[in-house]
């Protein structure tokens, strides 16, 4: 992949940095793995806004990605690497020996024509999926399950990965990209390697319109609103919040932890780095 810096021929082009997609498949996505994706614009069934700053954006289909990788001992050939508008990572279309096709998250250095396989007897090779108990300590992994058979939930975005640190009893210790070390059951599956499109973090959108293409609407500061619209609103001219930072409903937004899942707290060996 290559980084493309756009010439500053206009204010919208100035500072724009794109990621080359020359190595990706140029045709249409595989129709058998597409599903319609309807615009909700952040509204619920009553039409009320439940998530702000959503709406508009380019229409696209959802690509059904296989996060379980549960076709064991059946080799699959990589037919093509594709762009996916629903995620930062690229996806790979693989064809199994029995003729079934599935999309998977494309690992780095996975090439068209390569063969991948899942299962406990799979070799340690990029793109292969195994239970954590069969993966050597120190390996770089991605698409990690939190519950056996539930499908990958960790390290799925572009350029991400985790490191298998140790195994103790029925749990393994995995260090995330954030620095957090977490216990994961050894029967959970993970894929060897790291996710492709690692240069995604170098992308610069260049103009506000690109965010609108992505379906993201503007965010207005509370201090720029009227008092009826936000607790920070009002005042003559430019004024500060006048209080601790809160959201539009008066809830504190800075300086305290919001995680409340105490049930899985024991699975965290060390917290992430700030």
UniProtKB/Swiss-Prot annotation:
Quaternary structure annotation from Swiss-Prot or TrEMBL: Part of the 50S ribosomal subunit. Forms a bridge to the 30S subunit in the 70S ribosome.
One cellular component (GO) term of this entry: large ribosomal subunit
UniProt KW rRNA-binding keyword: yes
Family assignment from sequence similarity: Belongs to the universal ribosomal protein uL2 family.
Region (Disordered): 224-256
Gene Ontology molecular function terms on file: rRNA binding; structural constituent of ribosome; transferase activity
Protein name, as recorded: Large ribosomal subunit protein uL2
BP terms from Gene Ontology: cytoplasmic translation
Any Pfam family the entry gives: Ribosomal_L2
Database matches in InterPro entries: NA-bd_OB-fold (IPR012340), Rib_uL2_dom2 (IPR014722), Ribosomal_uL2 (IPR002171), Ribosomal_uL2_bac/org-type (IPR005880), Ribosomal_uL2_C (IPR022669), Ribosomal_uL2_CS (IPR022671), Ribosomal_uL2_dom3 (IPR014726), Ribosomal_uL2_RNA-bd_dom (IPR022666)
The protein's role, per its UniProt record: One of the primary rRNA binding proteins. Required for association of the 30S and 50S subunits to form the 70S ribosome, for tRNA binding and peptide bond formation. It has been suggested to have peptidyltransferase activity; this is somewhat controversial. Makes several contacts with the 16S rRNA in the 70S ribosome.
Superkingdom assignment: Bacteria
Signal peptide extent: none
Keywords: Ribonucleoprotein, Ribosomal protein, RNA-binding, rRNA-binding
């Amino acid at each position: 992949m290559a980084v493309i810096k756009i010439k500053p021929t206009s204010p919208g082009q100035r500072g724009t940095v794109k990621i080359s997609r020359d190595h990706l498949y140029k045709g249409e996505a595989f129709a058998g793995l597409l599903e319609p994706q309807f615009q909700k614009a952040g509204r619920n069934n009553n039409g009320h806004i439940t998530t702000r700053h959503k709406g508009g954006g380019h229409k696209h289909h959802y690509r059904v990605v296989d996060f379980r990788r549960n076709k064991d001992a059946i080799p699959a050939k990589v037919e093509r690497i594709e762009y996916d508008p629903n995620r930062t990572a690229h996806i790979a279309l693989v064809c199994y020996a029995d003729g079934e096709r599935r999309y998977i998250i494309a690992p780095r250095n996975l090439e068209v024509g390569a063969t991948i396989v899942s299962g406990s007897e799979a070799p340690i090779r990029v793109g292969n999926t195994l239970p954590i108990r069969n993966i050597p300590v120190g390996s770089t992994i991605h698409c990690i399950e939190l519950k056996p058979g539930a499908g990958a939930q960790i390290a799925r975005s572009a350029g991400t990965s985790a490191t298998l640190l140790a195994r103790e009893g029925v749990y393994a210790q995995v260090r995330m990209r954030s620095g957090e070390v977490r216990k994961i059951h050894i029967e959970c599956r993970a894929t060897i390697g790291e996710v492709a499109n690692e240069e995604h973090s170098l992308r610069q959108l260049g103009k506000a319109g690109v965010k609108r293409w992505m379906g993201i609407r503007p965010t207005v500061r509370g201090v720029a609103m009227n008092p009826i619209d936000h607790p920070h609103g009002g005042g003559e001219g430019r004024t500060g919040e006048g209080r601790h930072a809160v959201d539009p409903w008066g809830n504190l937004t800075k300086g305290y932890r919001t995680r409340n899942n105490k049930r899985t707290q024991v699975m965290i060996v060390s917290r992430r780095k700030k």
